[in-house]
Amino acid sequence: MGIESIIELIETLRGKDGCPWDRKQTPQTILAYLLEETYELMDAVESDDPAEICGELGDVLFHIFFLISLFNEKGYFGIKDVVGQNEEKMIRRHPHVFGKDTVGSVEDVKKRWYQIKMEEKNVSSETSILDSIPASLPALMRAYRISERAARTGFDWEDVTGVTEKVEEEWSELKTELRRQKEPGKDHRRLALEFGDILFTLVNVARFINIHPETALRDATNKFERRFKHMEKRIAESKRDMRSVSQNEKDAMWEEAKDSIG
C-alpha cells in the first residue's frame, strides 16, 4: 500500500456506503485524535521499540491524511498541494544546500532559517516576532520558544551565570511569598506568579545549556515513575499497603530503587 491507497481508503470510509463515525468527523475532531496519536508516538520513541514506533507513525500519518482529505472534499487543497508546498519551503530554507549560500556552523543555519522564515511571513517592524508562536503550545514548550525568539533580538543575558543568578533571585522571592502565605486571608495568585517566574527562568537556563526543557522534564518524570513503581512492587511483595509503610522505610526503598534501576 502507498499514499494513493491510504487516500482511497479514507475516501471509502467517508463515502456514501462508508463508516458513520468516519463520515461524521471534522477537522476539529480529527485534530484531537491527531494530538493523542502524537503523544502515543512520543511514548513509542521513548521506548525505543522500532515495531511500536512504526505502528504509531502509521496512526499519525493516517490522521494527517484524513485531515487533508477533509479539506480536499471542500476543494481547498489535496495531498499534492501539501507535499509540494512543503518541498518548496524546505528547498527555500536550505540555500546552503540548494543555493549558493555558505554557512559555518549549526548556529548559522538556525539564524538563516529564522531570517528566511520571517521574510516568508512578511514580518515588519510593526509586527511582534512573537506573534507566530502558537498560543496552544504546551506551556513549557511555548516558554522555550518565546525566550528563544526574544533572545534573537539581543534581549538576553550575557551568559548562563546571569540566568542562574536570576533563578536564585526568583527563588528568594518565592520563599518570601511562601512566608507571607502563612498569614490569614492571603490568596495564592501571587504565589502562582512567583512560581511561574522560577519556571520561566529555568527554561532560559535550559536554553543556555542547549537542553530542551520539555525533554528534560519528561525524562525526569519517567525516572521518578520507574523508581516509584519499583517501590510499589517491593511493598506489594511484602503484602503491605503503601500507606502502612513508614516514611523511613519508603526512603530506604527509594534509595534502593535509585541504585538498582537508576
Per-range role (PLM):
Residues M1-E56, F62-F195, F200-G262:
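Flexible "arm" and connector segments at domain edges
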